[in-house]
């Protein structure tokens, strides 16, 4: 059997950005069963803007952007042919219509990668948390609150508070002395006319990540950005609700199924039934004070 870097692995999860981060603990398991192996980390071309966040990860030997936006091409298949262990990077849901009432997203991604629950349970608590290396310089903006207000490139409204909710809390934050930096998709609505509010959705994705990393904390929703800053171990508040429906099954149990892991346990999840608008703004403001 091949050993060390001669043993090559293709994986882990190519899209979407949040999913690729949720799947990072699979690398910890692979390192246990194939020590010192060479690991290709495939990223779908449509998510290539996120590639820099994976630089310096200790268990990623090479990042490979797929030949096509959403699937592999000849170059990808040629590499896979040389690999000794291949993980389906676009797998089906492990347990469609019910997983979100039983487990969180990290465990679901682990099972979707083809491994067993018993193997997931063997990981330590730290190994179950996605990790990213904060390798770039960060400019501290300790008086600025970052918000990533909308999910799914602004198209999945049920996963986030309404515009009205955001406008109200931004006004309260600014009146309390904070500056507010709005990150996300460039087509998202502007939420304030205040000089202490800035919209940065026109910046590149990676520039947004770098700028946000210097803020006091970020307020996110059920979206990939929450997983990025959780993997960096940065302070964050995540606004959650039971929005999800799959195969006619509603999300009624395991309320934190969509909560991001935070590598340094610096995430506070605020959950409300039916809508994020039901999360009390006073609770959000108090949570910021408590950080």
Model-derived features: where do they sit?
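Active-site and donor-binding regions of nucleotide-sugar-utilizing enzymes
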Residues: 1-104, 207-210, 217-220, 225-228, ...
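Charged active-site motifs of nucleotide-sugar-dependent glycosyltransferases
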Residues: 7-8, 140-146, 178-179
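Conserved catalytic-core segment of nucleotide-activated headgroup transferases in glycan assembly
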Residues: 20-21, 26, 33, 152-182
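Short, charged/polar "capping" segments at the starts of alpha-helices
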Residues: 46-52, 155, 186-192, 245-250
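Active-site regions of enzymes building and remodeling cell-envelope glycoconjugates
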Residues: 57-65, 84, 95, 191-202, ...
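Mid-sequence helix-capping/hinge segment at a functional interface
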Residues: 92-160
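Donor-binding and catalytic core of enzymes assembling or modifying cell-surface/extracellular glycoconjugates
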Residues: 163-242
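Nucleotide-sugar donor-binding patch of glycosyltransferase catalytic domains
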Residues: 230-291
